Amino acid sequence: MNQVRKADPNNKTVAENRKARFSYEVLDTIEAGLVLTGTEVKSLRQGQANIQDSYASVEGGEIWLINSYLPEYLQANRFNHEPRRRRKLLLNKREMAKLSQSVDREGMTLVPLKIYFNDQGRAKLLLAVGRGKKLHDKRETEKQRDWSREKGRLLKERG
């Protein structure tokens, strides 16, 4: 029996950095856990977050998410969180070593792509290892996107 599954409410994207794929050449992605307080999780469950200007940094053998914005939870009292605090990312030692090595030696950048809840209801961050694109690379990407869109229109018109 084929059953149509509804979208799992626990597996939802909270915030997405759509500009990252345009500004960076994504070479590798990795899933990382986030160390969050209770009010941060509640704020995320309401779908409020912004990771547009955020990045990850390797400091002291740990990886930190910097400049991400999780607004304060409105129903919280005086124990609310700071919206732009640094958040620690949870990774294995091998994964951390691999990421720190690529950032140090090859001049790559750690860019967050999206924050979401997995099947167990845990907040996860999709982290990309990327190299910044130059202006001509961005123009080339734009040309390819426009051409594929135009090609689709032409094929649709012909039937």
UniProtKB/Swiss-Prot annotation:
Keyword RNA-binding: yes
SUPFAM superfamilies reported in the protein's UniProt record: Small protein B (SmpB) (SSF74982)
GO cellular component, one term: cytosol
Positions of disulphide bridges: none
GO molecular function, one term: RNA binding
Pfam family, one: SmpB
Keywords linked to the UniProt accession: Cytoplasm, RNA-binding
GO terms, biological process: trans-translation
CDD domains in the record: SmpB
Family assignment from sequence similarity: Belongs to the SmpB family.
Functional description taken from the UniProt entry: Required for rescue of stalled ribosomes mediated by trans-translation. Binds to transfer-messenger RNA (tmRNA), required for stable association of tmRNA with ribosomes. tmRNA and SmpB together mimic tRNA shape, replacing the anticodon stem-loop with SmpB. tmRNA is encoded by the ssrA gene; the 2 termini fold to resemble tRNA(Ala) and it encodes a 'tag peptide', a short internal open reading frame. During trans-translation Ala-aminoacylated tmRNA acts like a tRNA, entering the A-site of stalled ribosomes, displacing the stalled mRNA.
Name the UniProt record assigns to this protein: SsrA-binding protein
